[in-house]
């Protein structure tokens, strides 16, 4: 992959995360943290939906040539997100709090309104 392709993909990902934050806020989610990183993984968005802590993975694509965006949340990726979520919960002393894993899939076709699919409870805690 060329460096400009990587930069374009990073920019697309950042745009997708900004779109997802606006989408979630519009649905009364409280954004707690963005881009939480630890040695075992990363969580794009951590939010609250009422009393539930929601760990959100955002996937953005320009087209579906390689399948829908959510298809890239593989079992391996789910394990990484789960480990990062457990780390975050432990750091905040919230291991007993209700939590779930959502995916926000965004298709950002050229010059078009983004197509957003919010998949609640997209996967279970994975080890």
From Swiss-Prot:
Pfam families: UPF0102
CDD domains linked: PoNe_Nuclease
Molecular function per GO: nucleic acid binding
SUPFAM superfamilies found in the cross-reference section: Restriction endonuclease-like
InterPro entries: Restrct_endonuc-II-like, tRNA_endonuc-like_dom_sf, UPF0102_YraN-like
NCBIfam families given in the database record: PRK12497.1-3 (NF009150), PRK12497.3-3 (NF009154), PRK14675.1 (NF011268), YraN family protein (TIGR00252)
PANTHER family referenced in this protein's UniProt entry, alphabetically: UPF0102 PROTEIN YRAN
HAMAP family xrefs: UPF0102 (MF_00048)
Protein name: UPF0102 protein Gura_3756
UniProt organism field: Geotalea uraniireducens (strain Rf4) (Geobacter uraniireducens)
């Amino acid at each position: 992959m060329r460096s400009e392709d990587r930069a374009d993909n990073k920019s697309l990902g950042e745009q997708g995360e900004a779109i997802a934050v606006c989408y979630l806020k519009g649905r009364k989610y409280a954004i707690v943290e963005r881009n939480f990183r630890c040695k075992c993984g990363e969580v794009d968005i951590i939010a609250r939906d009422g009393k539930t802590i929601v760990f959100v993975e955002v996937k953005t694509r320009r087209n579906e040539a390689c399948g829908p965006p959510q298809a890239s949340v593989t079992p391996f990726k789910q394990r990484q997100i789960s480990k990062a979520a457990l780390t975050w919960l432990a750091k905040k002393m919230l291991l007993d709090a209700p939590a779930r894993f959502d995916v926000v899939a965004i298709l950002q076709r050229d010059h078009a309104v983004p197509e957003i699919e919010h998949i609640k409870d997209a996967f279970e805690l994975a080890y």
